[in-house]
A protein has these predicted regions:
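Active-site cofactor/substrate anionic-group-binding motifs, chiefly glycine-
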Residues: 2-60
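Well-ordered secondary-structure scaffolds
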Residues: 17, 119, 138-278
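Alpha-helix C-terminal capping segments
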Residues: 39-53, 72, 131-136, 171-172, ...
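Phosphate/diphosphate-binding glycine-rich loops and adjacent basic-rich segments that engage nucleotide
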Residues: 90-139
Length: 278
């Protein structure tokens, strides 16, 4: 009840985004640098025809959050009105949540956490749920990496967090699928915004030298989220989420969608992985 009340109160401290129908989202508890799956998952989900307004942090406990990495190729600071316009036009976005002001009480707490490089488990749960509710999400995939150097170091803790996420999901009418995975190293090759962006585009371009571990994780998360969305989409209940995600990646549709998102966010849509150098 305390988690529910705190989440509800944090959502009420700022504006909310609203979109019709299925609104997908993804979050990773993080703790490992160089694993920038969001920038692969978002264009895959949007290419599948689902709305995915992704708001991300710049960084809390790693060198480069998703917002920093996306900022290499596009603007990430927008108002709620601008975000709504972008998402209505191209189906998705990858923007900095701190500028939007969704659940702003959380951003104040993040300023405390950053110098400590620490987040409590319950704070992670409340923070994630408040942001997702404020962004209008109703279908969510959660990535909970577990390992000796992760924010979550024991599987029993991840399982407890998963149960709490599911409980809050029911209270707020949000469908959630949780991916608990053992993580001992980064899935990509680069550390830092430019190199992590290069990893992302190597996967989207299907470059021969792309980081396969990053691709595999992004496809797994995309697949779980698509399956969750398909279950509530007439005529798509029997489709395989991960197989669909792979088809969208291999066909180039995910890359094309990413270029649409970059263009809509004022960036250079013709960016290539081999041009991304520090």
């Amino acid at each position: 009840e305390e988690l529910y009340s705190l989440t509800k109160a944090m959502v009420a401290t700022g504006p909310r985004l609203k979109f019709p129908g299925i609104v997908a989202d993804k979050h990773s508890a993080g703790g490992v640098a160089g694993t920038r799956t969001t920038m692969i998952v978002v264009p895959i989900i949007a290419a599948a025809g689902y709305t995915i307004p992704k708001t991300s942090t710049r960084a809390i406990t790693s060198p480069a959050g998703t917002a920093y990495t996306m900022e290499v190729v596009a603007t990430v600071t927008f108002t709620t009105t601008q975000i709504t316009r972008i998402v209505e036009k191209v189906g998705g976005c990858i923007v900095w949540g701190g500028h939007v002001g969704l659940a702003p009480a959380d951003d104040i707490l993040i300023q405390v956490e950053r110098p400590l490089a620490f987040e409590s488990y319950d704070k992670i749960i409340v923070s994630v749920m408040a942001k997702k509710i404020a962004s209008g999400a109703n279908h969510l995939v959660l990535d909970l990496p577990v390992g000796p150097t992760m924010k979550i170091q024991h599987f029993k803790d991840a399982e407890l967090m998963s149960r709490k996420f599911m409980m809050l999901g029911k209270r707020f009418k949000m469908k959630i699928v949780v991916d608990i995975n053992e993580t001992r190293q980064n899935a990509g090759r680069g550390i830092g915004p430019v190199l992590e962006a290069r990893d992302v585009f190597e996967v989207l371009e299907q470059a021969p030298e792309r980081p396969l571990a990053l691709e595999a994780k992004a496809l797994r998360l995309s697949g779980k989220l698509l399956s969750l969305c398909f279950a509530d989409t007439p005529g798509k209940k029997d489709l395989d989420g991960e197989e669909t995600a792979r088809e969208l990646l291999l066909s180039g549709k995910a890359l094309a969608k990413m270029r649409e998102i970059i263009r809509a966010q004022g960036g250079h849509p013709d960016v290539l992985s081999n041009k991304l150098t520090p």
